[in-house]
A protein has these predicted regions:
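Active-site-adjacent structural elements that line small-molecule/cofactor binding pockets in enzymes
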Residues: 1-182
Length: 182
């Protein structure tokens, strides 16, 4: 979140965001307040990509979020996080400050069919990590588009792809660079 604020503060029109907050490592309220702050400072320019991968080993995961039950909680955590961006209801005990009523474009990140189905069910944009799972790209995109349910956040499916791209001064150098990524 710190670098997002720095980049947004030095630009005026581009959208800036996280290409992956691994939600298993963070409490939804904490993420909502951080991104609510950013969206309050830079309205209409902040994106929040949400992933379910731990991104680290078990010891670090426990240190980051000791009570976490596992990736199975991800859909509930996403829904909880999105709730914090809604207008606070009368009597609501826990609120994101700032965050409630703030527009943050949330994306589901994934490299499997699970993420595609979740994004479709929640009516959220989907970013597919084809650099991790290129063979799943077509199937995940098709499932997302077929199962997409319009929501208050998004009326039609929206897919973004993360790709590896290699540019080099010669074919030989390009081949060397490509094979080093495999």
């Amino acid at each position: 979140a710190v670098l997002i604020g720095h980049v947004a503060g030095h630009t005026s029109t581009i959208r800036v965001g996280a290409g992956g907050i691994m939600l298993p490592n963070h409490a939804p309220l904490q993420v909502a307040e951080q991104f609510g702050t950013l969206a309050s400072l830079y309205p209409g320019r902040i994106d929040l990509g949400l992933g379910r991968a731990p991104g680290t080993d078990q010891a670090a995961t426990r240190a980051l979020r000791r009570y976490y039950q596992g990736a199975d909680e991800f859909p509930n955590d996403v829904m909880e996080l999105l709730q914090y961006f809604e207008q606070a209801a009368p009597g609501q005990q826990v609120r994101a400050v700032p965050g409630a009523g703030v527009e943050v474009e949330a994306w589901i990140l994934g490299s499997s069919l699970f993420g595609a189905q979740l994004a479709a069910t929640l009516g959220l944009p989907y970013a597919f990590a084809s650099h991790f799972a290129p063979d799943m790209l077509e199937q995940a995109s098709a499932i997302y588009r077929q199962k997409f349910r319009p929501s208050a956040r998004l009326t039609k499916p929206h897919v973004m792809l993360a790709l590896n791209v290699v540019a080099a001064e010669s074919d030989a150098e390009e081949t060397r660079l490509c094979t080093s990524q495999q």
